[in-house]
Amino acid sequence: MCKQLIAAIGVVIAVAIPHAQSRASGVPAPESVFGFAPGADYKLATYEQSIAYFKKLAAASRCIRLYEAGKTTQGRTMYFALISTPENLAKIDRYREIWQRLAHPQGLDETEAKKLAAEGKALVHIDGGLHATEVAGPQHTPLLAYDLLSRVTEPAVKAMLDNVVLMLWPTINPDGQQMVAEWYMRNVGTPYELSGLPRLYQEYVGHDNNRDAYMLNMIESRAIEHTWRQWEPQIVYVHHQSGPFPTRIWLPPFSEPVGVEAPPVIAREVNMLGMAMAKGLDEKGQPGATHMGTAFDAWYPGYIDYAPVFKNIAAYWTETALYQYATPHQYTIDEFPANVRDLRPQSLYSSPWPPGWWRLRDAVDYMETASLATIEFAAKYKDSLLLNRYRAGRDQIALGVKKPPYAYVVPQQQRDPVAAVELLRRLAFGGVRVSQLTGDTAIDGTSYPAGTWIVPTDQEFAAMAREVLDVQKYPDLRQFPGGPPERPYDAAGWTLPLQMGVDVIAIKTPLSVEARAGMKLLGPMPDPKVKPTPYTASSADAAPFDSVPGAGFDTEAGAAAIVPPPGRVTGTGPILWVDAAQNNSYRAINRAWKMGASVSYANGRYGLSTLSEAQQNELAS
């Protein structure tokens, strides 16, 4: 195992870790870099400090490896750490093969899957969150890493790390952590101590940065998705802060409604994890855990912390109480809502939190307890987690064979041809496989030409395709019978073909042998032998048409193969007219301006003049 030395006890960590007698030698504490303990009053560690600490850990312990995941919007490097035993980390390539094989179950039977599950280890993603003003998340991850690495010889910790590889992200919004920490520390002790950051902590999107799971517009979202598809965790846990007052932490089960395409066994795992975390909190004497309620539902698949459910991963978030930043606050009973001032235990709120002080360190400790409970759960049930990943994917494949829609057909000829490409590229980047017809083919009684795209639903991530391509039917939930409807927590509908103006046909009859013979898979099947790489940063746009900037979706072969039909110039004349209804036209207009063209507008079209014939053809291609 890792080095060890008898040392003084620090903060006692939670769940299965008992009162300890030793710390492993050479494992530095966060204070050695931060100058203060994580969660200290009036103190926030920046992202740069956090990464400096994780690098120090990686240099000191054989139980941690640090990986680059990609670059942020502002150019910072995103990192995640793998924490486990040295023996497990030495076999990480083999375990990654197992995770990939179970995630993509084609040709794998139950017997072989059970053998792989028994051989493998659970892979658990935990991160410090992405809402940067919810400051406890990225303060708890360094402490979690330290408490695991410095106690690796303790039986409880060893039992966890023997069976789990922890994928720990210090934060998934590095830019935001840096901005918010610097802003708060600049204002501590002034009248502006609690003032809000006067700019978006995630460029362009702000607080909605966790609503990018299927559109993948943010470079950070693509870096995370790219990493997930290379490693395929069985659990994804994202920390948030804003639990319903006066509770101290909200945990799954979710409130109603939940996603109709969520695989049942995965939904059950999420519920079990929520209860395991609550149990761990009560065992530690940390009251105030609650579940369900009317706030946090799981209807919307845009959450980066819930969308993985539709790829057969137990994904969820929690909401830990927050006052403001690292400033402590003392609550009185008069601040509590009148209906909970009696502190009466409830079915899903069995240990009411009494009023008193609430500090950043309290939130950090609650988060660490919940994280450790998640790791402990994964260690105890690792065979089940691995096997259920296989079973859920297998069942999705079977569902696509026996229940419509059996596929989605996307013609190349569209009102905006590039919009169809953009929709499909996002699905493919997220692991949904897309095929293309090689010739004229009849499907569901209609003949489709070569080049038509097909998304079959007999594939393991088909639930994600159905979630975003079908029309949502929000349930009729009332506050009481005959009363007003309950307000949706977030989006009630998001049908991408309607939002993006793309013609998508749901196929109601099974794909024939002839139809399948005419389909060519775009990109290879996942290959676990391919070594993981960071999401590529590029200043040049990979796609010559209107798409996300930089490397975009081209780092995934299946997505890169989805391209619009070549454009062409028809007719003759001095003015090139482009359709104002097509997004790609505006890219062409900007390129034309750079060529020195004049731009006019008439009858719903833009006219680009003073261009040579060669320049016109270049813009249309």
Language model segments and positions:
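Active-site-proximal cap/loop segments of hydrolase catalytic domains
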Residues: 177-202, 206-209, 222, 226
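Intrinsic-disorder/low-complexity accessory segments
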Residues: 21-165, 205, 211, 217-219, ...
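Active-site neighborhood of phospho(di)ester-bond hydrolases with catalytic His/Asp-centered motifs
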Residues: 127-128, 169-171, 236-239
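Positively charged n-region of N-terminal signal peptides that target proteins for export
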Residues: 1-4
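Acidic, glycine-rich active-site loops and adjacent beta-strand->loop/helix elements
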Residues: 130-132, 170-176, 213-215, 243
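Proline-aspartate-enriched helix->loop->beta-strand connector
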Residues: 228-242
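Carboxylate/His-rich catalytic cores and anion/metal-binding grooves
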Residues: 145-149, 163-185
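Bacterial N-terminal signal peptides
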Residues: 6-16
